[in-house]
Regions:
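Short, flexible, mixed-charge glycine/proline-rich loop motifs
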Residues: 1-5
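Short metal-coordination and nucleic-acid-contact micro-motifs, chiefly zinc-binding Cys/His arrays
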Residues: 7, 17, 31
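Short cysteine-rich clusters marking metal-coordination/redox-active sites
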Residues: 11-14
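Cys/His-rich microdomains that often coordinate metals
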Residues: 18-21, 25
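Short hydrophobic beta-strand segments
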Residues: 34-41, 88-93
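Histidine-anchored nucleotide/phosphate-binding helix
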Residues: 46-57
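S-adenosyl-L-methionine/SAH cofactor-binding core of RNA-modifying enzymes
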Residues: 59-129, 133
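C-terminal folded domains that constitute the principal catalytic or ligand-binding module
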Residues: 113, 121-235
């Protein structure tokens, strides 16, 4: 049974129920390379979005929102990419001509800005075609790796990853053999907590199956949709 007593009372940072907020666990990670997250406005409002969590977890990151009903509200993506003149910009997108990210890193003589579109498959395809500045960027692909641990949505494509998982794998390549795995693990660790707390709030994960535990405040959330009395069980 769902534990979502007050679904509107969510942290504006991590989007979790206030009692489950994990913002205090997010310590921005320093990286040599930079992330530019281009997120669709509809995706930015979803509580299961992982791209914004990745952005909060990386110190060197820009977030640009597009796809508003009024185009004048969209952020200037092309302008942001133009400001990144000191870095090479590449687009993480599975185009037919996408090159392995590792090859691009091997050729680079300085920092890279990884541009990541965030939305549904249809939205990201449209973003690439229509957002000024994106279509001209060379596309890069990720190496093979473990299957997704994102159990909050159905993946439309076999082998698909959440946005955060894709960013984590990309930065494992970007940051090199020593720092890369550390960055990847830092991102995936906060992601695992996010997924676990969301599943618990939905009533899809029992207390006994929790790996990372819950904040004390969460123990007062009743599985019947209210606030439990002190000492009540929530399992």
């Amino acid at each position: 049974m769902s534990r979502r007593a007050h679904p509107e009372r969510r942290c504006p940072g991590c989007r979790l129920h206030l009692a489950l907020c994990l913002c205090g666990d997010v310590a921005p990670i320093d990286t040599v390379h930079r992330l530019c997250l281009v997120i669709h406005a509809a995706e930015a409002n979803k509580t299961t979005n992982s791209g914004l969590l990745a952005a909060r977890s990386l110190r060197h990151c820009d977030v640009k929102t597009i796809g508003h009903t009024r185009p004048e509200q969209d952020d200037d993506v092309a302008g942001a990419l133009g400001l990144a003149v000191t870095t090479r910009c590449v687009l993480l997108f599975p185009a037919d001509d996408a090159r392995p990210l590792a090859d691009v890193v091997a050729e680079a003589s300085g920092p890279i800005t990884l541009v990541v579109p965030d939305g549904t498959w249809a939205q990201t395809q449209k973003m690439r075609r229509r957002v000024p500045g994106l279509q001209a960027l060379p596309c890069v692909s990720l190496p093979a790796g473990p299957p997704t641990a994102y159990h909050l949505r159905a993946e439309p494509k076999e082998g698909g990853l959440s946005t955060l998982e894709a960013i984590a794998r990309a930065f494992c390549v970007l940051e090199g053999p020593q720092a890369g795995p550390v960055v990847e693990e830092g991102l995936l660790s906060i992601f695992a907590r996010f997924v676990e707390r969301t599943l618990w709030m939905r009533g899809q994960l029992a207390d006994r199956d929790l790996v990372y535990g819950l904040p004390d405040a969460a123990r007062r959330v009743s599985p019947r949709g209210g606030v439990a009395a002190p000492g009540s069980s929530v399992g």
